[in-house]
């Protein structure tokens, strides 16, 4: 992250901490996962119209199932930023093999937008990843501007499909 952007990120963090009671937490086994995923969905849908369109009832069920599986495996990193006790931003991510993989995010643009809750939550998540020993913070797909402000770099994403060819019994000999 360039020096100017580091300064801007720290400035946003300090402003939030000065103007509100800031909380940050990662969802764990002690939390009600279903309720936390519901809160993630509310914030994710509120953040942008295309995200609201993406989060169909079927996709909501998918996120719930993935969250349960990944939490039980120890990989889920569902974070929330609270401002004055109200959930203001969230990240749905995974930590695996010393990599922090950001899958989706959201924030409430109508509440505390002047405090940049999405940026602040992201900065706390990056700080967590560093403290946890992650060597890579992967923003994954998408070219949203904020990713580049946090130092994201493009890389090729390749898809490979492997299938087993049908072999007749005569060919197996």
Model-inferred region functions:
Residues 113-126:
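Conserved acetyl-CoA-binding loop-helix of GNAT-fold acetyltransferases
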Residues 83, 134-173:
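Active-site/acyl-donor-binding loops of N-acyltransferases
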Residues 65-68, 124-131:
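Short glycine/serine- and small hydrophobic-enriched flexible loop segments
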Residues 76, 131-134:
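Short, high-confidence coil segments that cap the C-terminus of an alpha-helix
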Residues 1-114:
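A conserved beta-strand-loop-helix scaffold within acyl/acetyltransferase catalytic domains
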């Amino acid at each position: 992250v360039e020096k100017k952007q580091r300064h801007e990120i720290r400035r946003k963090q300090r402003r939030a901490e000065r103007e509100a009671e800031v909380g940050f937490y990662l969802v764990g086994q002690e939390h009600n996962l279903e309720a936390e995923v519901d809160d993630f969905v509310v914030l994710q849908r509120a953040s942008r119209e295309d995200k609201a369109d993406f989060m169909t009832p079927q996709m909501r069920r998918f996120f719930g199932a993935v969250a349960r599986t990944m939490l039980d495996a120890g990989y889920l990193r569902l974070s929330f930023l609270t401002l004055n006790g109200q959930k203001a931003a969230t990240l749905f991510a995974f930590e695996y093999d010393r990599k922090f993989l950001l899958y989706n995010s959201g924030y409430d643009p109508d509440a505390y937008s002047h405090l940049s809750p999405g940026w602040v939550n992201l900065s706390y998540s990056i700080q967590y990843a560093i403290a946890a020993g992650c060597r890579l913070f992967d923003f994954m797909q998408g070219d949203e501007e904020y990713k580049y402000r946090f130092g994201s770099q493009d890389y090729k994403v390749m898809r490979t499909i492997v299938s087993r060819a049908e072999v007749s019994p005569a060919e197996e000999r």
